[in-house]
Amino acid sequence: MRFFTCVAFAACLASPGLAQPQTAGGSLPSPDELSSRDTLTVAVGGAILPDYDGSDDYRIVPVGAIRGRYHGISFDTSGTYLYVNLVPAHGKLTFEAGPVAGMRFDTRKDIEDHIVKLLPHRHRAVELGAFAGIGLHGLTNPYDTLSLRVDAAHDIGNAHKSTVVGTTLSFSTPVSRKTYVSASTGAEFVSNKFADYYYGISPADSLATGGVLPIFDADGGMKDWKASLLVNQSITGDLLGGLSIFGMGQYSHLVGDFRRSPIVADRGSASQWLGAVGLAYTW
């Protein structure tokens, strides 16, 4: 739902409950059998991403993610956020709902731009909220998923102290018993408090940069839109279990006052690219 210091790829990892067409032995479990199966996927890798949301400087960071299901309760991490779905999945039309919790690490520390670095550091945001979604299965084969998710989380810490709302539309399908692909698009909506905290330039901020960054009052609204693609390829076994390799790419574009903010328009770019590669293991 957000821009993360850890790239958000866990939500795109192959879901052992719904994404596999066939086991290594050749049998064909039903989608309901797969959706009731306890499973755990752990992924580690490396990602390249901007220094801050709107920067044109990039860095390489380690990333990790988990996704699983236990007794009908599923969970996954997306960047630094944990989603827990409390609604068991059965049938062609499924629903999801549950809590989401995480942290936003966009603090302006350890960035390359020498002008933006002069601005005051930002606190880490601690965000708690909830999400809900709907999924439709079996559009092109019995194991694909078209899903829509909406989430909202509020900062309970000492950062932007506001609510962030995100939407994600995704389509995921196996193309063989060893290969899985997922494409998604989404948008994020934030408040005036969020916009001012991360993208506004106060008179004191402008003075701290020697006037290089002009005073700017940022308004909230739609912050950005994004699109991503992930491919997961089994190395051992199949998508039901074993070792796999994944690669993903994401493009996002800042809009409105977020694009016009001096830290983006003058010192960065509205176009943001993220990429990650790594290994995953499914039990």
What label would you give each PLM region?
Residues M1-S36, G268:
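Cleavable N-terminal export/targeting peptides
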Residues T23-D38, G54, I73-F95, H137-L146, ...:
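Short loop/turn motifs that connect adjacent beta-strands in outer-membrane beta-barrel proteins
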Residues D38-V44, G64, F75, F95-P99, ...:
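Transmembrane beta-strands of outer-membrane beta-barrel proteins
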Residues V44-I48, G64-Y70, L82-P88, A130-L136, ...:
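Residues on the lipid-exposed face of transmembrane beta-strands in outer-membrane beta-barrel proteins
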Residues P50-Y52, V84-N85, H114-L119, A152-I156, ...:
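Extracellular loop and loop/strand-boundary signature of outer-membrane beta-barrel proteins
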Residues I134, I156-S244, Y251-R260, V264, ...:
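Outer-membrane beta-barrel transmembrane domain signature
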